[in-house]
């Protein structure tokens, strides 16, 4: 049959005689149709989700101590007498930037820096508490997992303020006024960040630090410099220790199945 040949011929002529306006319309239609195609979502790859539970029969842990080498800087006495309520707190009070006991360093944030997947805090995890007591932030350093919340309390008989100063855009700055013995307020922290400063606008000596970890494997050293990170899947990790004024140190550490790996860091005055 000759019908197919006849159908093709007028189409060929139509394409030759098409105007610029028609060409533009055809291109616009093609672009519109291509734009209707679904594009892959990047949310799953950029937004951390709760990590699956590790096999409890194989997990291990890391225990260690953070040491301080040399003579620690002298802690400076704080004058709280500008506020009568603060003046009634136990005196004297001292700065907390570097606290060393028997060559062991407190308030160091220790966490798995690499080797563990980033994950958000599981739903229902209680907030981490930062209290204002004795006109101080207690504890001086706190840590939570990204996606978690911090709860700010005021246990004092005077007004306080919680002013957070994040550098990560996904962590919103908070400037919270908290009257004496007021109801606690909470704030979310959605992005990993180290040593995020907290200040009180009413009492300039008050300061603390919030650490937002990318995974659930972290700790803050106690007064004796000790720390423990539990429930780690077997593997090799980069373990980081971060101090507010002394900086950061990293080491490689391997956690065998059902075992305890030992770690040690040593800081000194810069």
Model segments located where?
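Generic N-terminal leader/processing signal
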Residues: 9-14, 35, 197
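Bacterial N-terminal signal peptides that target proteins for export
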Residues: 11-25
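Bacterial N-terminal signal peptides
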Residues: 23-34
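Extracytoplasmic copper-binding redox domains, predominantly the cupredoxin/blue-copper superfamily
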Residues: 36-270
